[in-house]
A protein has these predicted regions:
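A structural signal for short, hydrophobic/glycine-enriched beta-strand patches
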Residues: 13-171
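Glycine-rich flexible loop motifs, especially short His-Gly-Gly/GGXG/HXGH segments used as catalytic or interaction
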Residues: 169-181
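Secretory targeting and sorting signals
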Residues: 1-14
């Protein structure tokens, strides 16, 4: 399904050279696949980075059919959250809704981790496979480790725009100080 979606849209899914390969001693029997959100357009539609992350997550979900898929991201625009848009795309591309766990309160990478780690544990996951963008990978890995997550691997695609990280970094530094409503 992901290959068909890519063929129809002209997009390709690439796994970053920095993706962590399976390591002896890590338990991949039931990982939770956590797809990190990215800000929506003002009209509530997905930006290309979020679309790529979601397709990458779908490819990983197909490789691990026993794994729950956690889509995480709030930041509503025009009545839609990042998580809701990812869920809609995954279902449209054939992922069973029963595999998807929606986390739609997070407004930063720190909160993605804080809210997703307990959901993964509740789902009985043996660890987490984080799906994000290459310029976001290091920070995401650290945030999930800080939140007590057992990060088995991180899968990312090259997004090639480190300047985007400045605003994200500032938001992530401030997010633990921001009340969640």
């Amino acid at each position: 399904v992901a290959a068909l979606a890519c063929a129809l849209t002209g997009l390709t899914i690439r796994v970053s050279a920095h993706a962590v390969p399976p390591v002896a001693g890590k338990d991949f029997t039931k990982p939770a696949i956590v797809i990190l959100g990215y800000g929506l357009k003002p009209d509530g539609s997905m930006r290309a980075i979020l679309y790529h992350r979601t397709l990458t997550g779908l490819a990983i979900a197909q490789a691990f059919p026993q794994a729950p898929v956690i889509v995480t991201g709030g930041n509503p625009r025009n009545g839609q959250t990042e998580a809701a848009q990812m869920r809609n795309l995954l279902v449209m591309l054939g992922l069973p809704p029963s595999r998807i766990i929606v986390e739609d309160r997070a407004n930063s990478t720190v909160q993605n981790a804080q809210f997703s780690v307990p959901l993964a544990k509740k789902a009985g996951a043996t660890g987490i496979i984080v799906v994000t963008s290459s310029t976001h990978q290091g920070r995401a890995d650290q945030n999930f480790a800080d939140a007590g997550g057992n990060v088995l691997a991180t899968v990312s695609f090259p997004d090639g725009n480190p300047s985007v990280n400045i605003a994200q970094f500032v938001r992530d530094v401030l997010s633990p100080l921001t009340p969640i409503g």
